[in-house]
Structures are given as structure tokens and as C-alpha cells.
Amino acid sequence: RWVRPLHSIISLFDNSVVPLSFAGIDSGDQTRGHRFHAPEPFAVTDFADYRGKLAGAKVMIDAADRRQLIASGAAQLAQDAGLSLVADDGLVAEVAGLVEWPVPMLGAFDRRFLDVPAEVLVTTMKVNQKYLSLRDGSGNLAPNFITVANLEARDGGGQIIAGNEYVLTARLADAEFFWT
């Protein structure tokens, strides 16, 4: 079983296709990039070509690279906002498995929700939304979060952030209701 549907199989040796079939899919030398940024198929000749062309087509094939980009990008966004990231390597790894081209973004939520215990807010953001939490200079939970988009938005992420803030408001309102 595959986490995502299997669409193609690249099977090459010495720049030639090694024919095989699996799950009704024949091997070849074609793949595709990011479904929004570079959806057109292209051929590859070897692993270096595969890695390079996919990177050019906005797909980071190495999960460790995606984890590093998420962690460093989130930490930088937090620092730029005068905040600190709540470390959560497990969540970073999970999110790295959900995206091909990670783009960390900083969002915010209404301060009124800070009346709900921090553990409830962090759990709601983590479990339901896959958001990283942030702390202020005093070590208290900040009314902000980091989400990770799977694309570079033309508007710099404004619509993505607004949409995530909207959804989080509903989630936190539910948490607030059940807590009080």
C-alpha cells in the first residue's frame, strides 16, 4: 500500500528503461513535477537527472531536506516575529511527509483564545491542523502559529494564511466551548 496513489514507475539502468509492471502500471522514464507549479510530464535519464529535474519542478524528493526546510523556515519566521518555536520534531516529520514543496507561513489567532489552557490550544493546533505553536519572549503561548503550505502562492501566501486563520478560529472556538 502507498500513502499516495501510485501514478508511474521509473525503472532505469544505464540510461535505458528496464521494463516491468506493477499494480497495472508499466515502467518508463517519465515523471511529473508539482501538480500546480510544474504538472507537465518529463523524461529522466538517471537518479541525478531525476533529482535535479524534480527540484526544478518544485518537488523536494528527500524527506530530510523537507524537514530541514520546515524547521529552519519556521524558526526564522518565529525569530522575525520576536517569538520562539515550540520544538516538535514529530510534527515537523509528519508535515514533511504531507508536502512536496514546503513553504512555512506565519499566522495568528484571536488573543481571547489564550484564556483556554495552552495545552488545549497546542493540541488542537497540532492534532487537527498540523500547525506548529509559538511562544512569546516570556515563554507563554503566543497567539500565532506556523502552517506549511505545499506551494509558493502568487500573493505571498496571504489567502492561504487567511484561510488557515479562519479554520483555526472555528477549531479554537470549539475548544473554548468544551473547556468552559
Language model features with spans:
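Amphipathic alpha-helical "coupling" segments that flank catalytic cores
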Residues: 1-180
